[in-house]
Design a protein with these regions (language model features):
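Amphipathic, non-membrane alpha-helical segments in soluble helical-bundle scaffolds
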Residues: 10-21, 40-51, 55, 97-104, ...
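Short, contiguous, well-structured surface segments enriched in hydrophobic/aromatic residues
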Residues: 48-85
């Protein structure tokens, strides 16, 4: 087989926020459909996956904007520090007392609880007067983060991620096409090699 000499010019860019947001979108729609059909078996696991994807997608979107807008962007900076840097750069007041930015902290805390998955041991020893029904409602074996596995928080988190993303993207003056994965290549023939 004859060899040829060519010049390859290639460029690719991958922005993982798209994949994470697509996963969040998938889970969000699946959860809504399942709840509409009263199909609740294992839905909390899908809520956990959805909220995790939303938290990761939001951070990836912030990293994307930081990468595009802020010189020497540090994607390893703390989560909330990065959000504050990007919002400041784009002239947005970061108010974590109200939505949608209140949700950012809740998602960050949720994410941090699950990853890296630190063990928690709690002990309690006391006598109480209660009813059997009250004992069952205590949720003693329920972790704090599990309270966020509910339809309303999933809806709010997904909606707030979209609100934040659309607002920041609009303010950034970047086009939607700037956010997509892509690339290209050209091959230029130089000569035959014997």
């Amino acid at each position: 087989m004859n060899k040829i000499k060519v010049r390859l010019r290639e460029h690719r860019h991958f922005f993982v926020h798209n994949d994470l947001a697509n996963a969040a979108y998938y889970f969000n729609n699946r959860i809504a459909e399942r709840l509409k059909n009263d199909d609740r078996e294992g839905v909390a696991l899908e809520m956990m996956a959805c909220l995790t994807m939303i938290a990761f997608a939001l951070e990836a979107k912030i990293n994307f904007l930081g990468y595009k807008l802020i010189p020497k962007w540090d994607e390893r900076a703390p989560y909330l520090t990065k959000v504050k840097m990007v919002t400041k750069q784009l002239g947005v007041a970061f108010d974590e007392q109200t939505r949608p930015y209140k949700t950012v902290r809740a998602l960050k805390n949720f994410r941090d609880t699950l990853a890296p998955g630190k063990p928690i041991e709690l002990q309690n020893d006391k006598e109480i007067i209660t009813t059997h029904e009250e004992l069952e409602k205590r949720g003693y074996l329920t972790a704090d983060w599990q309270s966020q596995l509910n339809e309303q928080f999933v809806k709010d988190a997904f909606g707030d991620m979209e609100i934040i993303w659309r607002d920041l993207l609009n303010r950034s003056k970047l086009e939607i096409f700037d956010t997509l994965n892509g690339g290209g290549s050209t091959i230029t023939f130089i000569e035959h090699i014997e």
